[in-house]
Amino acid sequence: MTRLLQPFVLVVTALLAAAYAYPAARLATGPWERGALAIPFVLIWIVPALYWTGSRDDEESWLDQAAHQASYLSMAWVSFLLVLTLARDILLFAASVLQSERTHAVIAQAGAPAVLVASLLAMACGAATALRGPRVEKIAVRVPGLHPDLQGFRIVQISDLHVGRSIRRGYVERTVERARNLAPDLVALTGDMVDGPVERLAPHVAPLAALAEGGRAFFVLGNHDCYSGADAWIAHWRETGVRVLQNEHVVLRRGAATLLVGGVVDPAYRARRPEISLQDAPSADFRLLLAHNPKLAPLGARAGFDLQLSGHTHGGQFFPWTL
């Protein structure tokens, strides 16, 4: 339990406690209801709190796996519950300001059950979406004046797999199979591939090596890759044939056209400056930047890149988690 005393863990645990306590206090009206509702909320909060502060001696045990799944489901639920509770309270405040007693009474009476049901449904939908596996989304990027030999160039981007206790080898195999079926000219691995050390997760990410055939797969670090041991993972990806870009670039040829692929590291590992990746770069018909964090886009554009591929946001988030 020494991890509990670490400042970061203390802060996260306190924030979790507040996130669970606020809905529990606001959704119950009387003291008996508050007490009855507080018990399950405390129990649900304890699961992730103990999981994140406990031992990591046996991460593959069924008990650890169960605690892991329960903790993430718990936090997913409270992320919806907290936002919906805040929305309900804003509506109550608006009804009070407008002196609409009827509206206030309806929201006060029906709001709590509606919030609980809606948050559980949202969590269930999210879990079902995750269990379905990777989804292919095809996006056509139209580039005025693109060199004819680069027309139809196909890039497959894979990002934020977070291979670890939840995402295992089977999920990675399905991802690789779908990627190969798309017949890509280039594979962009834009960070956060793992959540754990090489010695534990190497067998689970092994299928990704199949995408490196012909030197077409490129990888840039994400923040979670850095937390998981950046140097060890960089060495591992290079051993598999994946080309790791750390504030550097490579130039590919397709017919008479040239494609420059630049990559920047995540700030969790080292300074991120897209212009560094263009140092001593020749002219190219198209410049592609791989960066885990999309906030680098303005810097990338100023540096002279035509397109940036990023991850980090998991396909988009909802307020206030976008702050």
What do these predicted ranges mean?
Residues 1-134:
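Non-catalytic terminal accessory segments
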Residues 122, 139, 259:
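A broad, low-specificity signal marking well-ordered, structured residues that form hydrophobic/aromatic
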Residues 133-145:
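Alpha-helical transmembrane signal-anchor/signal-peptide segments
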Residues 142-323:
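Soluble catalytic domains of enzymes that build or remodel membrane lipids, polysaccharides, and related
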